[in-house]
Every structure is written in C-alpha cells, then in structure tokens.
C-alpha cells in the first residue's frame, strides 16, 4: 500500500479504515459508486470481471451503488467477506464544518456468507445459517443462527457426530477457534465442506466473555431465568452473538433466546445416510434427482425452508407425526379446500425475513407493502379455514391471527407502486399527511405556480412581456426589457444587462425556496413516516412471527396433500411398535422415471433382518434406499409411496450403500466403508433402521465374507435393529439357519433362450447365481472377453488350474 504521507485526504481516510478491516474487501462509498483500491481492487476486478484502472499509482475499480447487491451476491457466494463503508453526511454538511472538511465515512455493516438478510442475496427456499463450534476439554457444542429469520438453536454433540450435524444444518459460514482446527479429527470433517470459515483465537470463545454478551443482548443480569445454558453451551451461543453484533455494527434484531435442539425429539440420520440417500442433492451435487426435488410442492419460501428443516431432522414422536398426518389427511379429503389454500399461499411474501429487515432498519417500502398484502392474504386463509369446525384447523386459524388495524395503517400510508429504496421518495400516500401533501403539490405544480405569479406581476406592473426565468446563479428572477423599468419597491433589482433588467421579490424567493426544498423535505418526511410505520409493524412482531411459522406449516402440509393426491401416496400407520411393514412400496424418486416394480417388505420382530442376494443390476440398492426413504417420509408427516405402511417409530437411520465409494480425507474406499459400518454397529439401537449394501466387497473374499458375517451377527444379536442387508456373498444365506430373526430374500431373475431378464421383484429365498458375466455383456464387453470369462468360470467351478 502507498505511503500514507503521500496520498490525498480521501485516500488517507480509506487507508485508515482498511487498517481496521484488513480481512475484508472494503467497499468505499464515493458518490454513486463503491470504490475498491490496492489489492482489494486487483482481486475484486478479476472475480467480478470489471475494469481495473489506476489513479496515479493506485489500482482501483468500482461498482455502481444502485446495482451493488448483484456484485455483493457473487462475492458472498464465493465466500468473501465485505465491509460496507458509507458516507455519513453530504458534502454540503461537511462544508459547514469548514470549506476543506472531508465527508465523514465509516463502515456501517459487514457482509459475510452467514449474516446476510437482504432478499437479493438470499436463496428463497434455503436457510442461511451462521454456525459456531466450541470445544472445552471433552465437551463439544454447536450453535446455529439464521439472522434473516431469527431462528437460533444449540446442541451438545460429539466429534463422531459432527459430520452429521454440519450436513444436517448446512451452514453458509462456520465460526471456530484457531486451535480447534488443529485437531485432526475435527479438521478432517470440516475440510470436506465448502462453507466459509471464520477463525478467532480461543480467548474469543471464553465462557465469561460469552456470558456477558448474552446478558447484554437479552438485557438481564443473569441467565438463570432464561434457560438451562451452561459451560460450553454459554460459550458457543455467546460467541456466535458477539460475532453477529460485530458484523451488524450493533444493529441486531430482537432475537429469541437460543433453543436447545433435543436429539431424542428427532430422528438422527447419520452423514453417510444423508449423502447416500440423496435427500438434498445427488452424488454429483445436483438438486434434480434428489428426494427434496421430488417431494417439494411448497409455494412459499418459508414453507420450502421448513420442509428442508423437517427432512433433515424428521420427528421421532408418534403423537407429533400423527398430528401432521391428520392435517394432511384432512386436506387430501378436502381437495377443493387445499387447492384454494395453495392459491392464496402463492400470493404470500416471505414475511419472516421481511420482519427481520424491519427490526434492523434495513427494510424497503416494497417490503412493507408486501407485508401488507400478505396480511390481507392471511385474512383470506382464515376465512377459508374457519368454515371447518375441526380442532387441528381451528388451531391454524387462531395462530394466523387477524391484522385489520395494521392493514388499515399500511393501506392508508403506502402507495401501491412502493419502491425498493427510500432515498428517492414517492412511496408514501400524500393524503396521509397534510405537510407531505403540500410538498408534493409544490413539486407537481411548480411550473403552474410560477406562471400564476408571472401573470399577477404582469397585471401589477402592466408589462405584458414580463417573464419569470431561472438560472443556476440567480435562481428564479423577474426579467423585463430595458424599456420597461419597474418602479415598485417590492421588486428588488438584481442585474442589468444591455437589453434587459432582472429583479426578484420576497414572494418569488419564498416560492423558489419552497420549490427547491420541497423535494428534499418531502423525502425526509416520507422517511420519517416510514420509520413510524416500521415502529407500528414492530409492535406486532411476535404475532407476525407466529403467523409466519403457521403459514410455513400450512404450506408444507398442503404440499404433502398435493404430493399424496398426485402420486397416490397412502397414509402410514405410525406407532411405538417395532413394525416396518410395507406393501407395494416404491422409490419416491426413481418411480418418476417410468414403469416401476413395487415390492413388499415386513421387518417384524420375528424377521427384523432381511438378507437379500441376487445379481447387480437387479435392483437391490434401489430397494434398500426405497425403504429408508419411505421411513423418513413417514416421519416428516408425509404420506408414502406404498399401498400400505405400518412403521414403528425410528430413532436413527444408517446407510452404507455404494454411493460413498470415493476417496475422502485420504482414506481408501474400503476404509470409508469400514468407518461407515463402524458408525452403524456402534450407534444403532433396536429402534434404528439400517441398510447395508455389499459390506466387505472392498477386500479379499475371505476377509470380506468374515466381516460381513460378523456385522450381521452384531446387528442381529446386539443392536437388534430393523435392517436390510444386501450381499453378493451367497454363503451368508446360511445364517437364517441359526439366527432366528433373519429371513433370506433374493431378486427374481428369469432365464430364457440363453438370455437373462431382471424382474426387479423381491421374493423369498436365496440366489445361487451372481450373473456378473451377463452384466458385463450388457455393459458392452467385447464378445471375446465374455467368452473367455465364461471359460475361466467353468474351470474355477471344477477347481481346474487356470493356467493349463
């Protein structure tokens, strides 16, 4: 950076601010542009593909203020953090302090991937979490906050479950201590993710410091009356808040006290299962082809976010699940109603996020107008639902609430074409304020008022050629020819020219002042009225929050009804038994691709482990995933793709299916397989649901068979989980002879005229063939290679020497 003694006052101001925000790209406001200088300019110009110029020896680039959010969006998505420096006064205000006074500037907020609240920077149906992990000795806690909605949770966890926690939460930014990343077990997990990482020294996470932050934020002297936070939980929640306060420069919305995420209330889906089952994205990272893409019929942003939260943490209480199922069933049985409800929902804005922007004084007139329209739509929802005298629906009506008074205030004050920024005015109804009406009248009628005054002066002076003109030096002035001098003390001489004489009057000066200042005055008054409207909205904040949550829930449940009706899903029976009985079940994603063969499964207590043999390509993996997905769908309160489903509550879902066959963190494929299998046998309970595919295939035959055999015994005898185990080891089919709760099944195959047909049906019994050579033929192996493989297989069957 250039020597500070050789640069202009403006650049000195920039350098001083940049020293305070070294880790951020500094967007420095100069007039209608945000400018970047030095290394920031070089880096940003490359990222944004904008022109890099120089002023002297100083590299610089800039983006227009009015379109800055487009550029911010790109930078934030790439994980950059930006300090926004604004002008805190006008140049006129600066000159009042002295002719050469520099306009005051300061950083007013810091934009980071986990702390954004602007709609233009957020994905509508994606939560935008900032997370924090703190470890003290053997205790580990994680907290996460979505600033745009106020959702704030914390959870005690273990390093072994950290991968699952991070995958479930999906933060955009992670706050950690430097020394935490020095722990290999933690670093190996975190480095797999693409979120932005913000590091501080361990002193930032000090418990006493965090305690004081929490007390200051919630305005209390002790935390005892607010919750059961202790030790590392205090550290993780307080540190997270301190970081948010720093990024928002003190402009923090009113947040509820952090809520404990109680794992026992929710189904635990381990990281391998979240990935292998493709709940949120395919193995290639695409949304299309994932479970959520197949079941998301929500029509509001908040409903979409709720669906994703529910899918990442399904319910684990039969009562809670059945409450949702009852609502879905009600809507399925009243299709005209749910279609009408969904039509109303389509006109609803994201008031959860709008409310946060109102609280931190970062909302726009358009936001308030959208809020007004949504509250009107809420009244329509209540009218639709209150016709049904059913408890679960009446509860929705109560929680939706009514807002006649607030709607009236907003209706009377806001113009329909409300704009996205307050800086230019034009969004407040002039009829709501007499002073504003006068300002607007002056602006709209300035030409007419000048002409009326001109006509009056012509009558007074008897000079019909008299004109009222304007220039930047004199402002408005009266002009007559030199032959028609005005002899009236009310007309003050200003200027004499060769052919004309110019005058002014007190009345003309006052009118000029009104015309020139009316625009600024009207904008200032509109901003003041807008501030009062925001204060009026904040009075309803708690009620609006409940309404927003209710809208999201109604949207999600009516989307489940749409899913059930469109694809003929059935209502599952959910209870506290250990049943898993599915008739004519289908894979909710794969069935959309065309004809799909439905299959049954009954993992009752008498046959809680199913061992499935059969060739590759026959559909074993699809069948395994299908049943895990049916179980998960049932636990979020959705109907399921089956004719019948009876499912006892599942506490955990584990999956070791081939989709993880890649090298992660330097581990071999086989090591990854063993790690995922170890998680199953170490954590699964008798309420868990386990799917295991081809355990042991990544090593030698005897090693693999021995591992697979012992894993099945462990799950059968110790874990006692409901499990489906697919294998190519036909020897394992002997296990049903001495493990009484195992039943063998295989994939149905027909052979005809030398051809093999995979029927994708599950039937009782064990397969005695792998059909591997046939699959190789289907894959396009040359016939010579296929023939050679068949010849060698025949020799192996008769124990002949392959080299003879």
Swiss-Prot record:
The protein's matches in PROSITE patterns, at most eight in alphabetical order, are given as: DNA_MISMATCH_REPAIR_2
Tell me the GO BP annotations in alphabetical order. Answer: mismatch repair
Which InterPro entries does this one have? DNA_mismatch_repair_MutS, DNA_mismatch_repair_MutS-lik_N, DNA_mismatch_repair_MutS/MSH, DNA_mismatch_repair_MutS_C, DNA_mismatch_repair_MutS_clamp, DNA_mismatch_repair_MutS_core, DNA_mismatch_repair_MutS_N, DNA_mismatch_repair_MutS_sf
The UniProt keywords, alphabetically, are: ATP-binding, DNA damage, DNA repair, DNA-binding, Nucleotide-binding
Kindly give the Pfam families that the UniProt entry links to this protein. Answer: MutS_I, MutS_II, MutS_III, MutS_IV, MutS_V
Binding locations of ATP: 614-621
Q: Which GO terms describe its molecular function?
A: ATP binding; ATP-dependent DNA damage sensor activity; damaged DNA binding; mismatched DNA binding
Q: Which family does it belong to?
A: Belongs to the DNA mismatch repair MutS family.
Q: Which NCBIfam families match?
A: mutS1 (TIGR01070), PRK05399.1 (NF003810)
Q: What does this protein do?
A: This protein is involved in the repair of mismatches in DNA. It is possible that it carries out the mismatch recognition step. This protein has a weak ATPase activity.
This protein is called what? DNA mismatch repair protein MutS
Q: Which gene encodes it?
A: mutS
């Amino acid at each position: 950076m250039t020597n500070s003694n050789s640069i202009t006052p403006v650049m000195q101001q920039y350098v001083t601010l940049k020293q305070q925000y070294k880790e951020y790209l500094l967007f420095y406001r100069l007039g209608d542009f945000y400018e970047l200088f030095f290394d920031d300019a070089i880096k940003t110009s490359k990222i944004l593909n904008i022109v890099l110029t120089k002023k002297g020896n100083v590299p610089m680039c800039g983006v227009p203020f009015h379109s800055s959010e487009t550029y911010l969006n790109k930078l934030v998505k790439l994980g950059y953090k930006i300090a926004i420096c604004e002008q805190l006064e006008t140049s006129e205000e600066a000159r009042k302090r002295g002719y050469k006074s520099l306009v005051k500037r300061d950083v007013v907020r810091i934009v980071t991937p986990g702390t954004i609240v602007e709609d233009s920077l957020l994905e509508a149906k994606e939560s935008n979490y900032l997370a924090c992990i703190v470890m003290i000795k053997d205790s580990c806690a994680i907290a996460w906050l979505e600033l745009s909605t106020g959702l704030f949770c914390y959870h005690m966890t273990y390093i072994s479950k950290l991968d699952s926690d991070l995958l479930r939460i999906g933060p955009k930014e992670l706050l950690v201590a430097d020394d935490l990343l020095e722990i290999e077990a933690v670093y190996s997990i975190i480095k797999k993710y693409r979120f932005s990482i913000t590091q501080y020294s361990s002193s930032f996470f000090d418990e006493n410091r965090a305690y004081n932050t929490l007390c200051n934020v919630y305005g209390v002297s002790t935390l005892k009356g607010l919750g059961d936070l202790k030790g590392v939980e205090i550290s993780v929640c307080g540190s997270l808040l301190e970081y948010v306060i720093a990024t928002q420069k003190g402009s923090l919305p009113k947040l509820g006290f952090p809520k404990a995420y109680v794992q026992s209330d929710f189904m635990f889906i381990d990281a391998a299962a979240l990935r292998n089952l493709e709940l949120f994205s395919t193995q290639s990272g695409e949304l299309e082809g994932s479970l959520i893409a197949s079941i998301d019929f929500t029509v509001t942003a908040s409903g979409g976010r709720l669906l994703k939260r529910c899918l990442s943490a399904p319910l684990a209480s039969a009562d809670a699940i059945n409450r949702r199922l009852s609502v879905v069933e009600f809507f399925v049985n009243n299709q005209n109603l749910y279609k009408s409800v969904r039509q109303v929902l389509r006109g609803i804005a994201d008031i959860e996020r709008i409310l946060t922007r109102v609280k931190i004084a970062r909302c726009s007139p358009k936001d308030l107008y959208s809020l007004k329209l949504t509250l009107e739509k809420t009244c329509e929802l209540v009218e639709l639902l209150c016709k049904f005298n059913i408890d679960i629906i009446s509860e929705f009506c109560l929680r939706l609430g009514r807002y006649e008074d607030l709607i009236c205030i907003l209706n009377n004050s806001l113009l329909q074409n409300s704009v996205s920024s307050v800086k230019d005015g034009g969004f407040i109804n002039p009829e709501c304020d007499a002073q504003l009406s006068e300002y607007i009248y002056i602006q709209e009628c300035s030409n007419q008022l000048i002409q009326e005054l001109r006509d009056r002066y012509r009558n007074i002076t008897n000079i019909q050629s008299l004109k009222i003109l304007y220039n930047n030096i004199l402002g408005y002035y009266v002009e007559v020819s030199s032959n028609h001098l005005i002899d009236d003390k009310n007309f003050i001489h200003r200027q004499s020219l060769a052919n004309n004489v110019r005058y002014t009057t007190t009345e003309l000066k006052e009118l000029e002042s009104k015309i020139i200042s009316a625009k600024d005055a009207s904008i200032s008054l509109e901003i003041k009225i807008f501030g009062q409207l925001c204060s009026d909205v904040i009075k309803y904040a708690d009620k609006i929050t409940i309404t927003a949550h209710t809208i999201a829930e109604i949207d999600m449940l009516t989307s489940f009804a749409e899913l059930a009706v469109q694809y003929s899903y059935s209502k599952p029976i959910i209870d506290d038994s250990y049943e898993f009985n599915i008739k004519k079940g289908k894979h909710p994603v794969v069935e959309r691709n065309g004809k799909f063969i439905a299959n049954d499964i009954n993992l009752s207590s008498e046959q809680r482990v199913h061992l499935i043999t059969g060739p590759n390509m026959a559909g074993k993996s699809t069948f395994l995933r299908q049943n895990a997905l049916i179980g998960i769908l049932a636990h979020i309160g959705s109907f399921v793709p089956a004719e019948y489903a009876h499912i006892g509550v599942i506490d955990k879902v584990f999956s070791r299916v081939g989709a993880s066959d890649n090298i992660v963190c330097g581990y071999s494929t086989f090591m990854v397989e063993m790690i995922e299998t170890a998680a199953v046998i170490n954590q699964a309970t008798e309420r868990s649901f386990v799917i295991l595919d081809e355990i042991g295939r990544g090593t030698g035959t005897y090693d693999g068979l021995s591992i697979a055999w012992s894993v099945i015994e462990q799950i059968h005898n110790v874990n006692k989980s409901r499990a489906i185990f697919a294998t190519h080891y036909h020897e394992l089919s002997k296990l049903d002879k001495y493990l009484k709760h195992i039943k063998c099944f295989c994939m149905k195959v027909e052979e005809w005229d030398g051809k093999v047909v995979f029927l994708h049906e599950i039937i009782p019994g064990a397969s005695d063939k792998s059909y591997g050579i046939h699959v190789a033929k289907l894959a396009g192996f040359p016939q010579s290679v296929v023939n050679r493989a068949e010849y060698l297989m025949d020799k192996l069957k008769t124990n002949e020497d392959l080299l003879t």
